[in-house]
């Protein structure tokens, strides 16, 4: 059969679906990239926060509406199904099949058999199989573990992704070796919490060991690590990231807040002062290191005083990149039962105010790259410009770099940065 796959949500879903595509192809099926050519459409969903759930529901109805026109069977899978299977099956009977969070081979078998598959509790993480690119790009997301044991009070992920399950270093290395042979120039390690990698398998935080192993592989490529939980970002992990030459000095550390009161309510263990000390130590050792974070505004109990402390924290740290999100009240979490809910309009105002502050900081932080030579990865072309990124930007969440010159997708070029705005930079090939 001909199978089309549409991915919603985080990079971890993208990695899952590319592996699933590989398993389906190994089983004799054809992967197609236009739904009108598909016998079966697989829609992968997200259920992390309200906006993600709403997007997933909207996409389900969009694909339901197009079923009669194109004649495909619709399979909806992923986190939304794992979390709300019974409700979805009852409310949207037009969907042909529902699949939750499961191993790619189990999912492929279920698709072939036409049976629903929703485990009581996810217990597997995929082992390496040959994967298929669902988009043409010079980078790949590699999932090193699944699930999470951290228990942040606002987070619903453990309820539908299960507890921590790490892949072996050997299995991850095999996958990365094959991706490099296929021409990938950037390997992006993802998980719910990359700092926890290996605790279940090796009884220790094994991210430094994994990074050293991957860094030893031949070839010119970047290694980027995302989702570094601040409470467990150790000196050993920081040192490995700073010392290994293929690991970019980009620290994605979602601190979530800067008020000690709110951090405690969130179930975080590091205080704002401890966070400042840790993040400042990275900059002291590597002044050009990029610090990225995520912030939740409007958490239950957040007062104007707490918000002012957050702004002061952000101004003091001077994050290079920052994503600010309005708190999403998720059933089943500890925070769901907290009193003193913040008015949504107030939370939205705080989000806008924080993003305006961050725009000024980001603009100022980019000043240091003007006139500098940076390695640039070509990802495409837009008008007269090559479009891509330097090591200072992660795909999809950060800005891009526009460069005058010649090159093709996957080329590393040396460029000099000429100018920038709050998020993007412009330069030319040397």
Swiss-Prot record:
Its cofactor is [4Fe-4S] cluster. It is an enzyme of class 2 (transferase). It is found in: Cytoplasm. Residues 1-116 form the MTTase N-terminal domain. The gene is rimO. [4Fe-4S] cluster 1 binds at residues 10, 46, 79. The keyword Iron applies. Its EC number is 2.8.4.4. This is Ribosomal protein uS12 methylthiotransferase RimO. Residues 134-365 form the Radical SAM core domain. InterPro entries: Elp3/MiaA/NifB-like_rSAM, Methylthiotransferase, Methylthiotransferase_CS, Methylthiotransferase_N, Methylthiotransferase_N_sf, NA-bd_OB-fold, Ribosomal_uS12_MeSTrfase_RimO, rSAM. Catalyzes the methylthiolation of an aspartic acid residue of ribosomal protein uS12.
């Amino acid at each position: 059969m001909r199978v089309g796959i549409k991915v919603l949500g985080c990079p971890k879903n993208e990695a899952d679906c590319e592996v699933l595509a590989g398993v389906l192809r190994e089983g004799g099926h054809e992967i197609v990239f236009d739904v009108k050519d598909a016998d079966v459409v697989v829609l992968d969903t997200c259920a992390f926060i309200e906006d993600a759930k709403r997007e997933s529901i909207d996409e389900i109805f969009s694909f339901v509406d197009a079923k009669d026109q194109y004649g495909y069977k619709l399979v909806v899978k992923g986190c939304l199904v794992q979390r709300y299977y019974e409700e979805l099956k009852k409310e949207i009977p037009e969907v042909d099949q529902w699949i939750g969070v499961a191993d790619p081979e189990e999912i492929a078998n279920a698709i072939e058999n036409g049976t629903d598959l929703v485990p009581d509790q996810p217990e597997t993480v995929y082992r390496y199989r040959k994967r298929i690119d669902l988009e043409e790009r010079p980078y790949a997301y590699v999932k090193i573990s699944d699930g999470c044991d951290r228990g942040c009070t606002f987070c619903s992920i453990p309820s539908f992704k299960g507890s921590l399950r790490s892949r072996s270093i050997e299995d991850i290395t095999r996958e990365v070796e094959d991706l490099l042979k296929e021409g990938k120039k950037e390997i992006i390690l993802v998980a719910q919490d990359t700092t926890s990698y290996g605790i279940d398998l090796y009884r220790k935080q094994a991210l430094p060991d994994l990074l050293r192993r991957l860094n030893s592989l031949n070839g010119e490529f970047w290694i980027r690590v995302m989702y570094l939980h601040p409470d467990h970002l150790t000196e050993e992990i920081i040192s490995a990231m700073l010392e290994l030459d293929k690991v970019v000095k980009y620290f994605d550390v979602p601190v979530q807040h800067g008020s000690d009161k709110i951090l405690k309510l969130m179930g975080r263990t590091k205080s704002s002062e401890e966070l400042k000390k840790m993040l400042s130590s990275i900059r002291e050792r590597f002044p050009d290191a990029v610090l990225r974070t995520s912030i939740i505004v409007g958490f239950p109990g957040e007062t104007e005083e707490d918000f002012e402390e957050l702004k002061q924290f952000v101004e003091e740290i001077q994050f290079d990149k920052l994503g600010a999100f309005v708190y999403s009240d998720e059933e089943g979490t500890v925070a769901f039962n907290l009193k003193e809910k913040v008015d949504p309009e107030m939370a939205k105002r705080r989000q806008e105010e924080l993003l305006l502050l961050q725009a000024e900081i980001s603009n100022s932080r980019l000043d240091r790259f003007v006139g500098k030579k940076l390695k640039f990865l070509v990802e495409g072309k837009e008008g007269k410009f090559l479009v891509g990124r330097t090591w200072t930007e992660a795909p999809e969440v950060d800005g891009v770099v526009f460069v005058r010159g010649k090159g093709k997708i996957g080329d590393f070029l040396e460029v000099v940065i000429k100018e920038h705005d709050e998020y993007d930079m412009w330069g030319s090939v040397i």
